Amino acid sequence: MLTTEIINEAVTRALHEDAPEGDITSNHLIPADATAVAELVAREPGVFSGGEVFAAAFKLTDASTAVELKIKDGEPFVAGQLLAVVTGNARAVLTAERIGLNFSQRMCGIATLTAQYVAAIAGTKAKILDTRKTTPGLRPFERHAVVCGGGHNHRYSLSDQVLAKDNHLAVLTRGGKDLTTELKRVRSEIDPAIKFEVEVDRIDQIAPVLAANVDIIMLDNFTLDELRTGVA
């Protein structure tokens, strides 16, 4: 979940990374009392995400900066649309702009691409879910963006759900373990409220996994024909 605390921590870290000793260009070139008005305008159509994060970049640089968001997370926008207006001390605005843009561009990009996938499966019972293959340190932001695009979050971390992947299964089979027996053992050991998912990459793995009464079977790298067979 993307909380204000998570946002402030990540944005503060990013601001320090970008200007550890301050913005020496703006501080020397721009008068201390100069003010500026900046507009965030879309170059391409998309789906918005990260408004609070964008605003935090400016607010954490100078609390007196005013950020007016013209759009909400999850809403679509068109090329040329005004998305936000920033008003404040010119030095502060110039110092924070790249961090604000870095977060908003990445999050809008993920939301926009997710929305395209969601549109592609419209009218079916399928759902678009994300994965743990996120940028280190940015997982809450990227997963929030997926939801903004109409997708759904899968397990958040290794602690949330049992997901036996191909490498887990490989260790078991190489050790001479019976797959169904081992999966049933895990099912009996974990809290019934915890989802139990197993990833398979071959058709012949489906039957022994089904016999273990797991909640979800992930078909990994299947061709379309293999998917049809596996689902049937």
Give the location of each predicted region.
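Acidic/glycine-rich phosphate/pyrophosphate-binding loops and surrounding catalytic core
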Residues: 1-197, 201, 205-212, 216, ...
